[in-house]
């Protein structure tokens, strides 16, 4: 699995480079710590016979923990479905049963995992093995799940290339504001980690507090984030230190900020990687979805 192999090599070369930061708690994990801790998750899952085509549900507190677990799950060759801790119990139970999950990983299980020795390497996987399940909100009925294969990880990395450059780069600090179960979260975090960038996880309430949002953007030196076009227009005066914005998920219209590279990304839950992209050069009443991403569509 190229993504995991590349991440392992990067972690060895840049052991102290920040990989994950929780903006709320200030918890920081370096690439070396992330790889070591995910190896403990891998070790736990391997001992419990959880590997290829087995699904686990991740429900750890929003911050660094869900990503430690997710990486460990992928190193074990298993699959994950992520839910937020504030999900309604009925919805959570339904997703657990519908996904066929064999393990529920909350903060207590996470702490148990951290007592295990760290396993090196990873299990072999096929690009068509199950890696992730993404569920809809269920506002029109029961949540519906989409199965994602390991191949999407490599496609997501290839889709990070726009024309002749990478959108997410090693120097970037990504503000993660999206729900953990959203496709956009995978679209943003996998390329960021692959390139050696830093992910700063914001609480879901931060975007509702403009002053706190601005404070976090400046305090954590955020250079890139995902926002809908509506949020961009509402908060454009607070984004002066941001260099790049990824937008999508709804109709993109009348979006342009001089001095900030804004990329309109077209994707789907069924794909979970960038299909088309456009670097916005002016305001459009209806922004084009752009051209197919290099090697991904």
In which residue ranges do the predicted regions lie?
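Adenylate-forming
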Residues: 61, 178-181, 205-206, 220-254, ...
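A short helix->loop->beta-strand "cap" motif at the edges of active sites that frequently abuts
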Residues: 78, 197, 240-243, 258-261
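Carrier-protein-dependent adenylate-forming modules in NRPS/ANL systems
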Residues: 1-151, 165-167
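ATP-dependent adenylate-forming carboxylate-activation enzymes
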Residues: 24, 60-64, 78-96, 197-222, ...
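Adenylate-forming AMP-binding core of the ANL superfamily, especially NRPS adenylation
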Residues: 39, 113-137, 142-158, 244-254, ...
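Conserved coil-to-alpha-helix start sites within the AMP-binding
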Residues: 60-71, 86-90, 177-195, 207-211, ...
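Conserved AMP-binding/adenylation subdomain of ANL enzymes
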Residues: 144-173, 179-223
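Short, Asp-centered acidic motifs that coordinate Mg2+ and/or phosphate
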Residues: 94, 102-103, 173, 223-224, ...
């Amino acid at each position: 699995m190229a993504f995991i192999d590349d991440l392992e090599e990067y972690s060895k070369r840049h052991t102290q480079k920040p990989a994950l930061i929780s903006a709320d708690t200030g918890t920081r994990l370096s690439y070396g710590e992330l790889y070591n801790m995910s190896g403990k998750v891998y070790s736990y899952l391997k001992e419990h016979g959880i590997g290829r085509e087995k699904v686990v549900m991740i429900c750890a507190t929003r911050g660094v923990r869900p990503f430690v677990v997710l990486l460990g799950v992928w190193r074990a060759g298993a699959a994950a479905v992520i839910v937020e801790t504030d999900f309604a119990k009925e919805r959570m139970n339904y997703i657990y049963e519908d996904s066929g999950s064999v393990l529920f990983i909350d903060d207590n299980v996470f702490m148990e995992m951290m007592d295990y020795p760290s396993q090196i390497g990873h299990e072999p996987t096929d690009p068509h093995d199950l890696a992730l399940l993404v569920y809809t909100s269920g506002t029109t009925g029961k949540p519906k799940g989409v199965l994602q294969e390991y191949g999407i990880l490599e496609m997501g990395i290839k889709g990070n290339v726009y024309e002749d450059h990478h959108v997410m780069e090693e120097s970037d600090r990504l503000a993660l504001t999206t729900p953990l179960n959203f496709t956009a979260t995978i679209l943003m975090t996998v390329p960021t980690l692959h390139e050696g960038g830093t992910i700063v996880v914001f609480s879901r309430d931060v975007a509702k507090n403009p002053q706190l949002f601005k404070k976090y953007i400046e305090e954590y030196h955020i250079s890139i984030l995902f926002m809908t076009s509506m949020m961009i227009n509402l908060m454009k005066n607070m984004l002066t230190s941001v260099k790049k914005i990824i937008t999508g998920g709804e109709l993109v219209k009348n979006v342009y900020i001089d001095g900030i590279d804004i990329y309109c990304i077209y994707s789907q839950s069924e794909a979970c990687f960038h299909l088309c992209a456009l670097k916005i050069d002016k305001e459009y009443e209806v922004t084009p979805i752009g051209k197919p991403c290099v090697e991904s569509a």
